[in-house]
Curated annotation (Swiss-Prot):
SUPFAM superfamilies membership: VC0467-like
Database matches in InterPro entries: AlgH-like (IPR003774)
Protein name per its UniProtKB record: UPF0301 protein RC0043
NCBIfam families for the chain: PRK00228.1-4
GO cellular component: cytosol
One Pfam family, short name: DUF179
Coiled coil stretches, renumbered: none
Disulfide bonds: none
PANTHER family tied to this protein: UNCHARACTERIZED PROTEIN YQGE (PTHR30327), UPF0301 PROTEIN YQGE (PTHR30327:SF1)
Length: 189
């Protein structure tokens, strides 16, 4: 038995296959891959809109200059550590980045970005995401082999599109797949 080749998926998007993942948090999910190494993987679901929050009250921003609520959508990034929040954003904002990608995207998780967004000085595009998705070593590779996920390149226009409910369908369309014609009987040739 030969060694498996490792393909780093950091900066890519995972698209849940429509007939394999049929319920739960991953049903019709899109996951932006933050990190993928031989030690495991971490990603953020970016199409699970949960609610809207006021940045000023949520982050307890103490500033009287902001007199009206600054409402932003909040997304569920996965089942792990819901108390952790991340801003997945365009790379035009580069203060105290947690991660920076080569596809015009970055991730921040500090209070400064929430204040900058509230004051209109933040990134042009951003999503506030709580929680994340994680895989143990080899787990994601196994899920890919069993066709739980499709992989696609991603760009900021796709991630920051207005309608989160249509992002998954748009991802399939981008891949040239019509959900109606997607077989529930899939496998590797």
């Amino acid at each position: 038995m030969g060694d498996k080749i490792f393909h780093n998926l950091s900066g890519k998007t995972l698209v849940a296959t429509p007939h394999v993942i049929t319920k739960g948090i991953y049903h019709k999910s899109l996951i932006y891959m933050l990190s993928h190494t031989e030690e495991g993987a971490i990603g953020l679901i970016f199409n699970r809109l949960v609610n809207h929050i006021d940045l000023k009250s949520f982050f307890k921003i103490k500033n009287d200059e902001i007199t009206t609520p600054v409402m932003v959508p909040i997304y569920l990034g996965g089942p792990v550590e819901h108390e952790k929040g991340f801003f997945l954003h365009s790379s035009d904002y580069n203060k105290n980045l947690l991660l920076d990608f080569h596809n015009d995207l970055a991730v921040s998780s500090n209070l400064e970005i929430s204040e900058d967004i509230a004051f209109g000085k933040g990134p042009k595009n951003s999503l506030f995401i709580v929680g994340y998705t994680a895989w143990k070593p080899g787990q994601l590779e196994e899920e890919l082999e069993t066709n739980l996920w499709l992989v696609m390149d991603c760009n900021k226009e796709f991630i920051f599109a207005d309608n989160p409910e249509s992002k998954w369908h748009n991802a399939l369309k981008h891949l040239g797949i019509d959900e109606i014609h997607f077989s529930s009987q899939i496998g590797n040739a």
